[in-house]
Amino acid sequence: MKHYNDLFKIIHREGYIFIASFALVSFLLASFNTKLGCIGFIATAWCIYFFRNPDRYVPINDDLVISPADGVIQEIKEALPPPELGLGDVAMIRVSIFLNIFNVHVNRIPANGKILALHYNPGKFFNASLDKASIYNERQSVLMETDQGQKIIFVQIAGLIARRIICDLEEGNEVKTGERYGIIRFGSRVDVYLPLKTALLVSKGQTTIGGETIIADFGRKKTAQFKFKRK
């Protein structure tokens, strides 16, 4: 039974209905036409691949902010936080991570701390790689306070293909770095907002691994010492 449980753990639950549907259609197609059946099974395999949910080795240190998503850093710029969070016109550093359809789409908590506020904002579905996606696209914004007292924001943004954002967090949740908290289906973007004086450890064009890549270090003046924990 443990092996079956392990199998389901490596696939995000949001994928179960898609995988089952693709598999059923594939069997039906195969009963009529072998080639169509093969195409269906290839699509099913891709669906399993898309919803994969691998463990990661998360760096454990209260000063660190880790990437909430797999992808490529599309942009790093000074920007105002999402207006729906009510933080006013205090500029922050925005690190934008673009996910293509081949990336792992499970999202992870970027730091230890407490969830202060969440806000879902319905919107449009522009290409997530465009700068205006941060403003106009459907998004789920999360404000948290880290254990070090720093306020940071992470935002799930739907893209041209992505049409569903899943966020399992609630206001008041105590969270740990690297914990899974949601998923965006089929191509998307995740923005991370940090205080202006934060020491960044990434650059534009860099590939990130959700739960592993260190984006920033609030204790950069100290000697960085941390361990890793599998999650």
Swiss-Prot record:
It comes from the Bacteria. The modification Pyruvic acid (Ser) is found at residue 188. It is found in: Cell membrane. Keywords: Cell membrane, Decarboxylase, Lipid biosynthesis, Lipid metabolism, Lyase, Membrane, Phospholipid biosynthesis, Phospholipid metabolism, Pyruvate, Zymogen. Binds 1 pyruvoyl group covalently per subunit. Pathway: Phospholipid metabolism; phosphatidylethanolamine biosynthesis; phosphatidylethanolamine from CDP-diacylglycerol: step 2/2. GO terms for molecular function: phosphatidylserine decarboxylase activity. It holds the Pfam family PS_Dcarbxylase. It is an enzyme of class 4 (lyase). It catalyses: a 1,2-diacyl-sn-glycero-3-phospho-L-serine + H(+) = a 1,2-diacyl-sn-glycero-3-phosphoethanolamine + CO2. Belongs to the phosphatidylserine decarboxylase family. PSD-A subfamily. This is Phosphatidylserine decarboxylase proenzyme. The gene is psd.
